């Protein structure tokens, strides 16, 4: 189940390190905890739709991989609708940007924080 779910979220060859990390950490959870976490994912897109309609006035940076097929479309819509939200999309990267491209992730975050 862990490997399958990891492959659904991170299917590309360049996502291998993130998949491996996900599976390793998921195995540390008790099965009951993992199932609760898995069910939580069903609530993500409705939650993102909610946040699209309710703007948070705090400056917010979303760092997403262009290959994050699960969440990027919703986050893109949200950041287009909110003045306080910014989106930084990392090319050739999947769901776990800080693992796949840590230098790019850190640079984007530090640059954003430096402008606040």
Locate predicted features.
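Short alpha-helical
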Residues: 32-33, 69-70, 104
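Post-His helix in hydrolase/transferase enzymes
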Residues: 99-113
């Amino acid at each position: 189940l862990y490997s399958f779910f990891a492959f659904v979220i991170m299917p590309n060859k360049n996502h291998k390190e993130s998949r491996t990390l996900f599976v390793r950490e998921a195995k540390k959870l008790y099965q009951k905890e993992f199932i609760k976490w898995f069910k939580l994912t069903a609530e993500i897109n409705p939650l993102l739709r909610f946040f699209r309609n309710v703007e948070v006035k705090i400056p917010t940076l979303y760092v997403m991989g262009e290959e994050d097929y699960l969440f990027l479309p919703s986050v893109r819509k949200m950041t287009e609708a909110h003045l306080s939200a910014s989106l930084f999309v990392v090319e050739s990267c999947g769901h776990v940007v800080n693992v796949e491209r840590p230098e790019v992730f850190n640079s984007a975050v530090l640059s954003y924080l430096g402008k606040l």
